């Protein structure tokens, strides 16, 4: 069987991996084997945290809405239920922004659903 040296293909592969990990500390950006492992781990974390980010933001929005609603003597649960019953279609992101930036508008929404 003939020997395959791979030439520039192997070097290009290694350089691509090292470029991916260029901001990492120590051997994780210098040595190919550890850089390759850390690069795969980084991609795994990125995939996982894309879902976690959505989860965390939804939790933050709910907390902000609940805090603003309780200032007006209504719980988050009752408020969301009343919004659906009155067919007011505002998502949690928009409600949280209204609660934080425009208190008068938020109070008006609560007045409509009570």
Swiss-Prot record:
One term under GO cellular component: ribonucleoprotein complex
One Pfam family named in its UniProt record: Ribosomal_L20
Gene Ontology molecular function terms on file: rRNA binding; structural constituent of ribosome
InterPro entries assigned to the protein according to its UniProt record, in alphabetical order: Ribosomal_bL20 (IPR005813), RIBOSOMAL_L20_CS (IPR049946), Ribosomal_protein_bL20_C (IPR035566)
An individual GO BP term: translation
PROSITE patterns reported in the protein's UniProt record: RIBOSOMAL_L20
Domain of life: Eukaryota
Keywords assigned by UniProt, alphabetized: Chloroplast, Plastid, Ribonucleoprotein, Ribosomal protein, RNA-binding, rRNA-binding
Subcellular location: Plastid, Chloroplast
Family per record: Belongs to the bacterial ribosomal protein bL20 family.
UniProt-listed NCBIfam families: rplT_bact
Function: Binds directly to 23S ribosomal RNA and is necessary for the in vitro assembly process of the 50S ribosomal subunit. It is not involved in the protein synthesizing functions of that subunit.
HAMAP family in alphabetical order: Ribosomal_bL20
Protein name in the entry: Large ribosomal subunit protein bL20c
Organism: Psilotum nudum
């Amino acid at each position: 069987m003939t020997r395959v040296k791979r030439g520039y293909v192997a070097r290009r592969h290694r350089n691509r991996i090292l470029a991916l990990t260029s901001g990492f500390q120590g051997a994780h950006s210098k040595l190919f084997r550890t850089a390759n492992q850390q690069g795969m781990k980084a991609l795994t974390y990125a995939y996982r945290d894309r879902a976690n980010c959505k989860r965390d933001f939804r939790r933050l929005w709910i907390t902000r809405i609940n805090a603003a609603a309780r200032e007006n003597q209504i719980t988050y649960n009752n408020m969301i239920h009343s919004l659906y019953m009155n067919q007011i279609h505002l998502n949690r992101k928009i409600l949280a922004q209204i609660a934080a930036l425009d208190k008068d508008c938020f109070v008006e929404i609560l007045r409509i659903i009570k």
